[in-house]
UniProtKB/Swiss-Prot annotation:
Membrane topology, as annotated: Multi-pass membrane protein
Entry keyword Ion transport: no
Encoding gene per record: ND6
Chief localization: mitochondrion
Subcellular location: Mitochondrion membrane
Catalysed reaction equations from the record: a ubiquinone + NADH + 5 H(+)(in) = a ubiquinol + NAD(+) + 4 H(+)(out)
UniProt-recorded name of the protein: NADH-ubiquinone oxidoreductase chain 6
Domain of life of the source: Eukaryota
Entry GO MF terms: NADH dehydrogenase (ubiquinone) activity
Pfam families attached to this UniProt entry: Oxidored_q3
Length: 221
């Protein structure tokens, strides 16, 4: 009896060592909260669902390894834009806006957009990493490495159908403090596209000064 079995090493970073179904949970969470953002009549509750939507998207991005973009979602959208919307909506007469709003007509459009988005997004991601073994010889040979291991090894206890699958990746909580993405983006912005960064800064400065000038009341002569 041959005790040597093929072990497939999948060079994969999309799940950061997590079970891939966690990505499905965050996808469903983001989809449902996005629907409630549209269907909720109370604007404040709608903004709270929007914060949950951005939180789910940020968690999804952190899990798949896009830590800089995921943290940017938390800082920019949740920390600034959503809270600003929440403060603005607190100054609005909510009862009047609730009487004038009718969001039931948006349900078919919401479902249609969700289906179209899912059809475009899901083919881009590995829905099931284990299913890749059925056709890795043809399409994913560069991502797989075959290693012969001995079945009597005490460290190998999770065999399924004589094949052991495991993924190598970076643990996501360690990637949160990893500055590779930030270093790469900063290097590009401050070296290659430095002139565009300066132009964008001047545009932002002009917008701030212009808004202050417009709001200042001119003194009556």
């Amino acid at each position: 009896m041959n005790n040597n079995y093929p072990l497939f090493w999948i060079n994969e970073i999309l799940t950061n060592g997590f079970v891939e179904y966690i990505l499905d949970i965050f996808s469903i969470m983001a989809f449902l909260t996005g629907i409630y953002v549209i269907l909720t009549k109370n604007p404040i509750v709608s903004v709270l669902f929007l914060i949950l939507l951005f939180g789910g998207i940020s968690s999804y991005l952190n899990i798949i390894g896009l830590n800089f973009i995921g943290l940017s979602y938390i800082i920019v959208y949740i920390g600034a834009v959503s809270i600003l919307f929440l403060f603005i909506l607190m100054l609005i007469n909510i009862r009047t806006s609730e009487l004038q709003s009718n969001t039931s007509n948006s349900i078919p459009l919401t479902i249609f957009i969700g289906i179209i988005f899912s059809n475009f997004l899901f083919p881009m991601l590995p829905y099931d990493i284990v299913m890749l073994s059925n056709f890795y010889n043809n399409y994913f040979s560069e991502d797989f490495y075959t290693i012969d291991v001995n079945i009597n090894d005490n460290n190998l206890n999770n065999l399924y159908n004589n094949v052991l699958y495991f993924m190598t990746s970076v643990i996501w909580d360690g990637s949160v403090i990893d500055f590779n993405h930030i270093t790469a983006i900063g290097n590009i912005m401050y070296t290659i596209y430095n002139i565009w960064l300066i132009i964008a800064s001047f545009i932002l400065l002009l917008a701030m000064v212009g808004s202050i000038v417009i709001t200042i009341k001119q003194r009556k002569i």
